[in-house]
UniProtKB/Swiss-Prot annotation:
Name of this protein: Nitrogenase iron protein
Organism of origin: Teredinibacter turnerae (strain ATCC 39867 / T7901)
MF terms in GO: 4 iron, 4 sulfur cluster binding; ATP binding; metal ion binding; nitrogenase activity
Source organism, top-level taxon: Bacteria
Co-factor binding details: Binds 1 [4Fe-4S] cluster per dimer.
Complex and partners: Homodimer.
SUPFAM superfamilies in the record: P-loop containing nucleoside triphosphate hydrolases (SSF52540)
Cofactor(s) for this UniProt protein: [4Fe-4S] cluster
Matching HAMAP family: NifH
Keywords: 4Fe-4S, ADP-ribosylation, ATP-binding, Iron, Iron-sulfur, Metal-binding, Nitrogen fixation, Nucleotide-binding, Oxidoreductase
Family annotation (Gene3D superfamilies): P-loop containing nucleotide triphosphate hydrolases (3.40.50.300)
Residues modified as ADP-ribosylarginine: R101
């Protein structure tokens, strides 16, 4: 099987890193060789696989060593649960420089050091929030990641982010092989959430590849810096991640998405009762004025 490179995008705080690590643990359990490349200055993309607070990042270690050329692959690549390879790109101090540069530097370093040559089945890039700035778009722009999965929920801002990320994919799809592979709904228990995300997926020309229900076992596992798969293999939630893993293994629906306009997105939210019908007469009015 040829190595598949997948990037996970989505609104900040949606649960991308947790979803990615649980998915990767399920893939490893199924016998797949996987590497996670964390593309977020927070460096929290590998903690559940490594049982660590935060892995040392390529950018931190390069700063200590002098340059990235002074690093060895074994300095930055750690192996965790299920023999999953873990790397964190990291970024500059807050308020200084461009964190996206860290992603570019890290991926180039991994390529030069042969990290991708070890007959891997999957590489997952866990990418910061809904920022589609140049650096964070690197896995898409440089044709590193071929499959993009967007973690979403029934909340309005998560859906806005999914639509914006789809626009970013369209921008680079024509020049490279990058495609949208599906939406992963990480449930927030909002009304008619699964129906809403299926409808959004249809508008974007893709699929809701899996609906992950909300379950407190995820938090219990996280407190112990573990994935559900490792912490409680018999939990129903662990089976949800296994099901997602199997769907990704067999997924062949890779599309150039069809992003919608803001009006169309708001229309969809109104259809599902998430947004109220817009009433022009209340715009710009304070609570006191509306009561008057």
């Amino acid at each position: 099987m040829a190595m598949r490179q997948c990037a996970i995008y989505g609104k900040g705080g949606i649960g991308k890193s947790t979803t990615t690590q649980n998915l990767v643990a399920a893939l490893a359990e199924a016998g797949k060789k996987v590497m996670i490349v964390g593309c977020d200055p927070k460096a929290d993309s590998t903690r559940l696989i490594l049982h660590a607070k935060a892995q040392n990042t390529i950018m931190e270690m390069a700063a200590e060593a002098g340059t990235v050329e002074d690093l060895e692959l074994e300095d930055v690549l750690k192996v965790g649960y299920g023999d999953v390879k873990c790397v964190e790109s990291g970024g500059p101090e807050p308020g200084v420089g461009c964190a996206g540069r860290g992603v570019i530097t890290a991926i180039n370093f991994l390529e030069e050091e042969g990290a991708y040559e070890d007959d891997l089945d999957f590489v997952f890039y866990d990418v910061l929030g809904d920022v589609v700035c140049g650096g964070f778009a690197m896995p898409i722009r440089e044709n590193k990641a071929q499959e993009i999965y967007i973690v979403v929920s029934g909340e309005m801002m998560a859906m806005y982010a999914a639509n914006n990320i789809s626009k970013g994919i369209v921008k680079y799809a024509n020049s490279g092989g990058v495609r949208l592979a599906g939406l992963i709904c990480n449930s927030r228990n909002t009304d008619r959430e699964d129906e809403l995300i299926i409808a959004l997926a249809e508008r974007l020309g893709t699929q809701m590849i899996h609906f992950i229900p909300r379950d407190n076992v995820v938090q219990r596992a996280e407190i112990r810096r573990m994935t559900c798969i490792e912490y409680d293999p018999a939990a129903k939630q662990s089976d949800e991640y296994r099901e997602l893993a199997q769907k990704i293994i067999s997924n062949e629906k890779l599309v150039i998405p069809t992003p919608v306009t803001m009006d169309e997105l708001e229309e969809l939210l109104m259809d599902f009762g998430i947004l109220e019908e817009e009433d022009e007469s209340v715009i710009g009015k304070t609570a006191a004025e509306l009561e008057a």
